[in-house]
């Protein structure tokens, strides 16, 4: 679960055929993350160690983008500028280049905690509810920034997006409530899936909060705070549980590589394909592939209402990602 933008810029724009290939590769990378988690949870690996190794990859990538730019050396003076610019920035003016360094830290630290929790709940969700439902709920997290944007900035969705939101809420209810047995409707309630939905959504929202007020120049520093904090929290939890097994650590590295390339290929695909095409296909196809792989490779069997919830999720993600 890396953010959708690293600050990559392709040296040249690929053709539409190449962009479509990049989109396919992004989908495959995103799908493989959930499937690797299924393997790690089936073998009961230490999820904190897996998460630590993943965020080591992410932190290393962020550091590579910061190398030689001198942003870290400017953090000390940036604190005072950040406090001076804060009132004006929150009124809609945004931060300047120096103040954005402080904003990167202010938003990046709590965002790192959300990213850590999102990865933990994704792994728990895969173990408790299967890879199909867990993958669906992690993708549904996009609804959280949409809802908060309505409340905070009055960004009203289109009629089509409202339809997608309604379908998404329906899928959440179907997955968590057994409507066929009203007396025990809440017996199927899964707090882990809801926590997965919320933490992934808040992690995505942190990106929007940074981008709304901060400068793109400091985006790499923001990512370093996000991944660095997630790494520190997960490393602390890993060290508390005892010996770290090499197989668990290598599995985490195996997650980190597709996690990185999912974002990389997604950005490359956007150079020739429209956003309104890329994101619905990316989200919906990933869920379909995860569900198919869950059934074929791991013999997961969803109940009828859970299958319907996955179908509604796919439809909802297509609709909410459609742009004006």
Residue ranges and their predicted role:
Residues 4, 12-324:
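Polytopic alpha-helical membrane proteins, predominantly small-molecule transporters/carriers
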